[in-house]
Design a protein with these regions (language model features):
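Glycine-rich cofactor phosphate-binding loops and adjacent beta1-alpha1 units
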Residues: 96, 126, 134-193
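Residue "hotspots" at secondary-structure boundaries inside conserved domains
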Residues: 8-11, 94, 177
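Short glycine-centered segments of the SAM/dcSAM-binding site in methyltransferase folds
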Residues: 18, 101, 183-184
């Protein structure tokens, strides 16, 4: 994010204007990770709803560096998912690169948002769920996924990138096996076994 542009937008806000406060609520701002734009890796990070009040609040005190102006076209219920699952998913999609065939391992909150963004970008989405999760597979297909199946069978094509949202470490070698040579595997979950 362009910090100068972000500060300018926030400076134009008035008291009472609506902003969104994401999961990452504050960092030290001086460590190598913060200086490199990788604040999510800061050892002194504080998280909204965990370390900081505000996860389900209508009002809270927040660090302006981590606030986003919410355009009026979004209702609160539409904007809120973008501030947690949406940010995690979008960042993961950016890290995954521009490949055409993207595999999403686990199809929950972040993956269903990424699916829609990737499809909008013209990519093919392959959704992989735990075996027997027909509901999630059906949901992925209803959003437009090219293919949806379980992690046991794997996708029908070689992937350019794989994004793991499921907290199951045993999926890492599977994803590596499903991605083409030189492809990218992104471990996007907050926790993984």
């Amino acid at each position: 994010r362009d910090d100068d542009a972000h500060r300018a937008v926030l400076a134009a806000q008035q008291a009472g204007d609506r902003v969104g406060v994401p999961w990452l609520g504050r960092t030290c701002g001086v460590c190598p990770y913060c200086r490199a734009g990788r604040e999510n890796l800061c050892d002194r990070a504080l998280f909204t709803g965990y370390d900081l009040d505000g996860g389900y609040a209508e009002l809270c005190v927040a660090d302006e560096r981590f606030c986003f102006v919410v355009p009026p076209l979004f209702r609160d219920v539409e904007a809120a998912p973008l501030l947690c699952a949406g940010l995690i998913g979008y960042r993961s999609l950016r890290v995954a690169g521009d490949g055409e065939r993207v595999g999403l391992y686990g199809f929950g909150a972040a993956a269903h948002i990424v699916c829609q963004v990737a499809l909008h970008q013209g990519r093919d989405v392959y959704a992989l769920t735990r075996p027997g999760d027909d509901r999630a597979q059906s949901f992925a297909r209803s959003l437009g996924a090219t293919w949806a199946g379980d992690t046991g069978e794997g996708p029908p094509v070689e992937l350019d990138a794989a994004i793991l949202f499921a907290p199951a470490g045993e999926l890492v070698p599977k994803a590596l096996g499903h991605v083409r040579k030189g492809g990218t595997v992104v471990c996007a979950g907050i926790h993984m076994s």
